[in-house]
Amino acid sequence: MKKSVYYFQQRDRQESILKETNIFERVPGNGLWWNKEENQWEKYPHILQHQDSLKNLFSPIRQEVMSYFEEYDIAWWREDDDRYFPTGNLLSSQIHCLNHLFRIRKDPEAVLSIIKAQCKDIVKVLPSPIDWHEYVFEDDQKKKINSYISFEFALDNPHLLQERTCKRGKDCTSVDAFVYAENINGNRILIPIEWKYTESYERDDEYKAKDYVVNKRYKDLASRDYSNLNGWKNEFYWDPLYEFARQTLLMEQIIHEKPKCGAFPIKATDYIHIIVRPDENKEIIDDIKQFKDLVKAEGKKRIIEVDPQELLSPLRGNEKYKDLLTYLETRYWK
């Protein structure tokens, strides 16, 4: 992955916040990261040391995020093989996504407010089809708590996409976040949310998807009448279009095949693909535009791109999330 001007701006920003604020509780940086050019591990100021990497997450969500990832056996994005602990990389988009969305995942009103601001026809968010509900006791009463945002969403990938596994966050098509919703007509809608932060991508052959993988798994699906991809394009062999295309196919296959999650099939008639990216990341914005230009007109209408600050703007004025917005403004938005 190449490094853009925006990447270096955000790296400098995170290093400054690490040194000058209490956001990371005054822990040092200089954690280890693999230098591909030098083929060795090196220390970097914007990488938290391993024992401090949990502090990359917003403090009120840390333990619950860890429990969530452990309960659903979700892999963390990391530079090494230890995929069971969050990365110390302050520029991680997985961490960026969790810091923005995890706090509100059990609040249907908050989740609906941010989704409806982007998709006006959505009138209701539904409990996650892949996360189990929880029970808590309040005033001696048993209360059911649902999750309305799933993270690292994957579902029946071996059947739907002919992939080897369905492990959330690793070795299969996953979506950073996912909302199951209902529109004004009572139809159920799949809302995958792909999250980008400082990413920019290279088109070198070493980053190209393998022909045999695409031919076996995705090319036929992309050519079916109901697919908005309108065939597998050459540009789809490279990220991020490779990600966007596979996520589109996963949603289309869920709609077409109605796979069961537990005892019940997941029913949906349509999808809305939300891609969250900072307004300042011009490279990823250009990539999204290219993807829109390559899909069918019906597919283009189903892609919504939004800046993370704009996405969470409906929460302004909500006292429940004042501390969250203050954190996000200090760390990412200002």
Task: Describe the residue ranges of each PLM region.
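Charged, terminal alpha-helix-loop-beta segments
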Residues: 1-334
